[in-house]
Curated annotation (Swiss-Prot):
This is Large ribosomal subunit protein uL18. Coiled coil: none annotated. GO terms for cellular component: cytosolic large ribosomal subunit. It comes from Chlorobium limicola (strain DSM 245 / NBRC 103803 / 6330). GO terms for biological process: translation. Belongs to the universal ribosomal protein uL18 family.
Length: 119
């Protein structure tokens, strides 16, 4: 499968799922983006069009993390869950953003669940 086919496939899946996935202030959307070497996660309030918080493997505290990419993703998920609980958010809607629920995306989701987020 060529790179163009992968990108268009992911975009189609993303567009299809975005019709059903919608977050609000009390139950925001947990959006995940996975690049080749990094991972980014955001809690988004779609009603107001605002990002409530974001955590990534590129943030200052996470740059020095060692281990496999999946280990780093799990830690990012834990950090996101802890920040969300500090703001009083316990329930979220998971948006895998067209990526397969496997590997690093699953590790981030598992880390967020370990921290106490429900989805």
């Amino acid at each position: 499968m060529s790179q163009i086919d992968k990108a268009s496939r992911r975009q189609k899946i993303k567009d299809r799922s975005r019709k059903q996935v919608h977050g609000n202030e009390k139950k925001p959307r947990l959006c995940v983006y996975r690049s080749l070497s990094q991972i980014y996660a955001q809690l988004i309030d779609d009603d107001n069009g605002k990002t409530i918080m974001s955590v990534s493997s590129m943030s200052k505290e996470n740059r020095a993390l060692e281990g496999t990419k999946c280990d780093v993703c799990r830690i990012v998920g834990l950090q996101l869950g802890e920040k969300a609980k500090a703001q009083g958010i316990t329930k979220v809607i998971f948006d895998r953003n067209g990526f397969r629920y496997h590997g690093r995306v699953k590790a981030l989701a598992d880390g967020a669940r370990e921290a106490g987020l429900v989805f």
